[in-house]
UniProtKB/Swiss-Prot annotation:
It comes from Vibrio cholerae serotype O1 (strain ATCC 39315 / El Tor Inaba N16961). It is found in: Cell inner membrane. GO terms for molecular function: aspartic-type endopeptidase activity; endopeptidase activity. This is Lipoprotein signal peptidase. Belongs to the peptidase A8 family.
Length: 171
């Protein structure tokens, strides 16, 4: 066995199974929503006094950013997702597998990004289905991929506040 394959097995890339799990769960849920729910507000399913299931198309990014454009944003967001996924995979390759916090954060972001890219390429839009609200205010609809991207990003931010182990001094 070569040193490079051993190093690869010890790298954070071992956590890519989590990205694959997120991707599969995200796409499966979206297919179930598309096959079993009517489109739009009139077909929402009221689950709790603050939560609906709702099948909608998002042609933009988070919070429908740029959704009113003519379609170029689909490719912009797809390109951004590919760049971010490549960058995070590179960082995972450089991290030891034992750095669970960061590897999990990166894998969650990768899985969510790839799930939304799949939608953009295959459907031309992202399927959203989670609708949380308070009174008459509705948070923009979102999906599992959006959630894992946000959780991963929050983990990265929180990691910035965690105490780092200092390297032993070389005296």
């Amino acid at each position: 066995m070569s040193n490079s394959s051993l190093a690869l097995k010890q790298s954070g890339l071992r956590w890519l199974w989590l990205a694959l799990l997120v991707f599969i769960a995200d796409i499966t849920i979206k297919l179930i929503v598309m096959d079993n729910m009517g489109y739009g507000w009139a077909n929402r399913i009221e689950v709790l006094p603050f939560f609906n299931l709702l099948y909608v198309h998002n042609y933009g990014a988070a919070f429908s950013f740029l959704s009113d454009q003519e379609g170029w944003q689909r490719w912009l967001f797809t390109g951004i997702a590919f760049v971010v996924t490549g960058m995070l995979a590179y960082w995972m390759r450089r991290l030891p597998a034992s750095d669970k916090w960061n590897n999990i954060a990166y894998a969650l972001i990768i899985g969510g990004a790839v799930g939304n890219v799949f939608d953009r390429i295959v459907h031309g839009f992202v399927v959203d289905y989670l609708d949380f609200y308070w009174g008459t205010y509705h948070w923009p609809a979102f999906n599992l991929a959006d959630s894992t991207i946000c959780i991963g990003a929050a983990m990265i931010i929180l990691d910035g506040f965690r105490a780092k182990k200092s390297a032993p001094s070389q005296s």
